[in-house]
């Protein structure tokens, strides 16, 4: 589909979405895009518009205690790993609140470069510029942490943390 930069989102999705379900419209992709509405316009650098279920219509009895054969899990928290090759319908729910940062090495499995991602995030959070530089802050962008943000069991907003760290570095070096 050919579209113009700045085209209204509603005109792009007209006839392709159901009005009776709660959906989340994302200007961009699921990992790095941002939430928008039908009244917003296509961003200049966006190459796609993504629509996913909001997930607010799901009530799960006993939540985390159930075996969840139909839920996707990166680290085998649910029994869904027994059914290989299955396609899952993901929604926008976080499924739990924020937790303390857990040093489990899960970022290292999905980061596109060979750095200590968890230590870099910790250095950014505390504002230790020397440690940030030693751990490779100049080599990363917020988008590099999109997949680690998806798999993060601590549910931290890693892309925002990295953006704040880069902004802090720019102010310090200016």
Regions found by a protein language model. Give the residues of each.
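Redox cofactor-anchoring modules in respiratory/redox and cofactor-processing assemblies
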Residues: 1-174
């Amino acid at each position: 589909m050919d579209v113009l930069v700045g085209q209204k989102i509603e005109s792009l999705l007209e006839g392709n979405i159901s009005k009776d379900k709660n959906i989340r419209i994302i200007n961009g992709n699921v990992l790095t895009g941002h939430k928008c509405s039908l009244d917003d316009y296509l961003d200049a650098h966006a190459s796609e518009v993504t629509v996913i279920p909001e997930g607010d219509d799901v009530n799960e009895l006993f939540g985390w205690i159930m075996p969840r054969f139909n839920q996707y899990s990166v680290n085998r928290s649910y029994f869904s790993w027994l059914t290989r090759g299955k396609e899952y319908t993901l929604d926008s729910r976080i499924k739990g609140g924020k937790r303390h940062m857990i040093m489990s090495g899960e970022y290292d499995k999905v980061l596109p470069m060979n750095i200590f991602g968890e230590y870099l995030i910790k250095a950014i959070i505390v504002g230790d510029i020397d440690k940030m530089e030693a751990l490779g802050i100049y080599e990363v962008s917020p988008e590099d942490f999109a997949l680690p943000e998806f798999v993060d069991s601590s549910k931290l907003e890693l892309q925002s943390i990295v953006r704040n760290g880069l902004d802090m570095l720019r102010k310090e070096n200016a």
